[in-house]
């Protein structure tokens, strides 16, 4: 029997190294096996990248992270060029090892106690009016990182009194009661937690997560804060069917979720789960129509949609696709 790999604290495991640590089998995708990207998935890069470099410099200066960079988001250039970013707190090393995600896995370091103040000042310097705060999973912390979220919310509001804050939280596995007790005292303006995909493929896509647990987290926050929008999203193209997506949408509505995002999964590297299909813009439009008919107050559905993509516009109920 082989000995378990001893991970050094603070070291990032990515791509092949990360996949080797996953308890499910993943197969490297050969070039000839890759699905050809359709025309609607082609991205145009901005001619001027000075704003992009400015945001990256501000992040580096303050030791901050963006999920845009860490997760290799396809919208990075567009969002950074418009002066928006989704900040990722609690470090850049995740205790989970989902095979769809490009965020590094490993043993995280102790959270930076100064991060809330640095984050708040950076947001003020950038002049942001709407901000999304997310994090890696921190199963090593007794509250899953909930207090750090609360500290960040408080610090941001102290320096930016009129700002709107959306949190994209992990599932706080095994720590839901403690986490919700903390977040109830300092709630965000929008509470977001992504289901990511349909329950049939959870073991393959989200090892270590539980579909019902995630639904319960969303439901319990909504019960505690009925006037605060709750939000969730899925990435499609991982083997699910459109009918299964619609059923997940029904589950979300049954658990009080009011905002929805649906976007196309893109394989970060050939070591990650492969794209099994590209969903057409017309199909996304049909799913949006279904969502609105179910009673969602807002549904952003399109190939490049991500949960924080133009999140300020989503919160205002404006169309994003």
Swiss-Prot record:
It catalyses: [[Fe-S] cluster scaffold protein carrying a second [4Fe-4S](2+) cluster] + N(6)-octanoyl-L-lysyl-[protein] + 2 oxidized [2Fe-2S]-[ferredoxin] + 2 S-adenosyl-L-methionine + 4 H(+) = [[Fe-S] cluster scaffold protein] + N(6)-[(R)-dihydrolipoyl]-L-lysyl-[protein] + 4 Fe(3+) + 2 hydrogen sulfide + 2 5'-deoxyadenosine + 2 L-methionine + 2 reduced [2Fe-2S]-[ferredoxin]. It is found in: Cytoplasm. Pfam families: LIAS_N (PF16881), Radical_SAM (PF04055). [4Fe-4S] cluster 2 binds at residues 94, 98, 101. It is an enzyme of class 2 (transferase). Coiled coil: none annotated. Keywords: 4Fe-4S, Cytoplasm, Iron, Iron-sulfur, Metal-binding, S-adenosyl-L-methionine, Transferase. Its main location: cytoplasm. Its EC number is 2.8.1.8. Gene3D superfamilies: Aldolase class I (3.20.20.70). InterPro entries: Aldolase_TIM, Elp3/MiaA/NifB-like_rSAM, LIAS_N, Lipoyl_synth, rSAM. Pathway: Protein modification; protein lipoylation via endogenous pathway; protein N(6)-(lipoyl)lysine from octanoyl-[acyl-carrier-protein]: step 2/2. One of its GO terms (molecular function) is metal ion binding. Residues 80-297 form the Radical SAM core domain. [4Fe-4S] cluster 1 binds at residues 68, 73, 79, 308. Binds 2 [4Fe-4S] clusters per subunit. One cluster is coordinated with 3 cysteines and an exchangeable S-adenosyl-L-methionine. Its cofactor is [4Fe-4S] cluster. SUPFAM superfamilies: Radical SAM enzymes. PROSITE patterns: RADICAL_SAM. PANTHER family: LIPOYL SYNTHASE, LIPOYL SYNTHASE, MITOCHONDRIAL. Belongs to the radical SAM superfamily. Lipoyl synthase family. This is Lipoyl synthase. It comes from Yersinia enterocolitica serotype O:8 / biotype 1B (strain NCTC 13174 / 8081). The gene is lipA.
